[in-house]
């Protein structure tokens, strides 16, 4: 990855992000939105980018990559990465850890997960999203979220981040990621993302209704 490529992809990512965020905030769409089924969601991934390289920027300063990217310490340092989230942490997966990057200015977070439909990755959604969000608050930060292939576990955690901290629906999050990298979470992870989507949509609708009720109450006051 050259610095020129990074700058170009970064410039292209911002307009895309700006186009998506208002869509989630539109009241009409928020009321009508219904979480699609697994097959419909998979079709969104298939319609996405065929691009599948070692690492791709999917959101400003946020990258999804594979094991080779995570193990290339020189490449990470040269590209300016400051944070690494390993979604395949552990001895039998991508065995890096904080010690692997101890001589580098990299903050590490590990998630010990298996790429199996029966594995409950949802318990890591909020901690992983919090790590990503905290990393992106730094002006010059650059975070790599990876697993073994950069297609399922890492993509799932990035999607959860966009839903939790960027107020995206699952559909908008998939479109944002899939247009920049070829990814496809397994069916079990998709089911968990669907459940998260339903919860977040319900919370946002509840907050919207409470806000509307508060405004009406304020209007009635003399």
Swiss-Prot record:
GO terms for molecular function: MAP kinase phosphatase activity; protein serine/threonine phosphatase activity; protein tyrosine phosphatase activity; protein tyrosine/serine/threonine phosphatase activity. GO terms for biological process: muscle cell differentiation; negative regulation of ERK1 and ERK2 cascade; negative regulation of MAPK cascade; protein dephosphorylation. PROSITE patterns: TYR_PHOSPHATASE_1, TYR_PHOSPHATASE_2, TYR_PHOSPHATASE_DUAL. Substrate binds at residues 146-153. It comes from Sus scrofa. Dual specificity phosphatase able to dephosphorylate phosphotyrosine, phosphoserine and phosphothreonine residues within the same substrate, with a preference for phosphotyrosine as a substrate. Involved in the modulation of intracellular signaling cascades. In skeletal muscle regulates systemic glucose homeostasis by activating, AMPK, an energy sensor protein kinase. Affects MAP kinase signaling though modulation of the MAPK1/2 cascade in skeletal muscle promoting muscle cell differentiation, development and atrophy. It catalyses: O-phospho-L-tyrosyl-[protein] + H2O = L-tyrosyl-[protein] + phosphate; O-phospho-L-seryl-[protein] + H2O = L-seryl-[protein] + phosphate; O-phospho-L-threonyl-[protein] + H2O = L-threonyl-[protein] + phosphate. Residues 201-222 are annotated as: Disordered. The keyword Hydrolase applies. It is an enzyme of class 3 (hydrolase). It comes from the Eukaryota. This is Dual specificity phosphatase 29. Homodimer. Interacts with PRKAA2. InterPro entries: Atypical_DUSP_subfamA (IPR020405), Dual-sp_phosphatase_cat-dom (IPR000340), Prot-tyrosine_phosphatase-like (IPR029021), Tyr_Pase_AS (IPR016130), Tyr_Pase_dom (IPR000387), TYR_PHOSPHATASE_DUAL_dom (IPR020422). Its EC number is 3.1.3.16, 3.1.3.48. The lineage of its organism: Eukaryota, Metazoa, Chordata, Craniata, Vertebrata. Keywords: Cytoplasm, Hydrolase, Nucleus, Protein phosphatase. Belongs to the protein-tyrosine phosphatase family. Non-receptor class dual specificity subfamily. Residues 209-222 have a biased composition (Basic and acidic residues). Residues 54-202 form the Tyrosine-protein phosphatase domain.
């Amino acid at each position: 990855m050259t610095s020129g490529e990074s700058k170009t992809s970064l410039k292209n990512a911002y307009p895309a992000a700006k186009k998506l965020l208002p869509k989630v905030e539109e009241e009409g769409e928020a009321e009508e939105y219904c979480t699609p089924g697994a097959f419909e969601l998979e079709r969104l991934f298939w319609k996405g980018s065929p691009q599948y390289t070692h690492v791709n920027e999917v959101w400003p300063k946020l990258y999804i990559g594979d094991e080779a990217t995570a193990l290339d310490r020189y490449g990470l340092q040269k590209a300016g990465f400051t944070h690494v989230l390993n979604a395949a942490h552990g001895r039998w997966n991508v065995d890096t850890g904080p010690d692997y990057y101890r001589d580098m200015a990299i903050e590490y977070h590990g998630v010990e997960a298996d790429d199996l439909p029966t594995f409950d990755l949802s318990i890591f959604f909020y901690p992983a999203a919090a790590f990503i969000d905290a990393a992106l608050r730094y002006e010059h930060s650059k975070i790599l979220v990876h697993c073994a292939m950069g297609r399922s576990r890492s993509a799932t955690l990035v999607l959860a981040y966009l839903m939790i901290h960027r107020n995206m629906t699952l559909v908008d999050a998939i479109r944002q990621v899939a247009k920049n990298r070829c990814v496809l979470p397994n069916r079990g992870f998709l089911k968990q993302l669907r459940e998260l989507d339903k919860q977040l949509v319900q919370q946002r609708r509840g907050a919207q209704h409470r806000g509307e009720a508060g405004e009406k109450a304020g209007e009635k006051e003399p």
